[in-house]
């Protein structure tokens, strides 16, 4: 009985989290010219970091060294996260002549 309740609660939390993420993803309407071609991603590296006695933090490993420790002000435990910013405005328009010329011919 205890396992069924725990499983039910986990599924309910995942459903609520999924709905929350979907709603948050639809927050932009695409009218903002500057945000249209920008993407900021955050991924959990699968580990946590802790503050040592000397005040330093344990190293975050994984994701080819792109993981960093993020923590709240007075907490002793943080999350190892990998962040990446991509600005697609640096790339040419997919319909430009340069892209069409570089496309393979049939």
From Swiss-Prot:
<keyword id="KW-0325">Glycoprotein</keyword>
<dbReference type="GO" id="GO:0005576">
    <property type="term" value="C:extracellular region"/>
</dbReference>
<feature type="glycosylation site" description="N-linked (GlcNAc...) asparagine">
    <location>
        <position position="48"/>
    </location>
</feature>
<keyword id="KW-1015">Disulfide bond</keyword>
<feature type="glycosylation site" description="N-linked (GlcNAc...) asparagine">
    <location>
        <position position="64"/>
    </location>
</feature>
<feature type="glycosylation site" description="N-linked (GlcNAc...) asparagine">
    <location>
        <position position="54"/>
    </location>
</feature>
<keyword id="KW-0732">Signal</keyword>
<keyword id="KW-0964">Secreted</keyword>
<dbReference type="GO" id="GO:0019958">
    <property type="term" value="F:C-X-C chemokine binding"/>
</dbReference>
<feature type="disulfide bond">
    <location>
        <begin position="60"/>
        <end position="80"/>
    </location>
</feature>
<comment type="function">
    <text>Salivary chemokine-binding protein which binds to host chemokines CXCL1, CXCL2 and CXCL8.</text>
</comment>
<feature type="disulfide bond">
    <location>
        <begin position="49"/>
        <end position="69"/>
    </location>
</feature>
<protein>
    <recommendedName>
        <fullName>Evasin P1168</fullName>
    </recommendedName>
</protein>
<feature type="signal peptide">
    <location>
        <begin position="1"/>
        <end position="24"/>
    </location>
</feature>
<feature type="disulfide bond">
    <location>
        <begin position="45"/>
        <end position="67"/>
    </location>
</feature>
């Amino acid at each position: 009985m205890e396992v069924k309740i725990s499983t039910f609660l986990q599924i309910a939390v995942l459903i609520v989290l999924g709905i929350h993420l979907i709603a948050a993803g639809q927050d932009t309407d695409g009218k903002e010219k500057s945000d249209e071609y920008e993407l900021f991603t955050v991924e959990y590296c699968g580990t946590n970091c802790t503050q040592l006695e000397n005040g330093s933090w344990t190293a975050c490993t994984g994701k080819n060294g792109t993981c960093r420790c993020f923590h709240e002000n007075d907490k002793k435990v943080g999350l190892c996260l990998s962040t990446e910013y991509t600005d697609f405005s640096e790339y040419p328009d997919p319909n430009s002549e340069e892209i069409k010329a570089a496309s393979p011919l049939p």
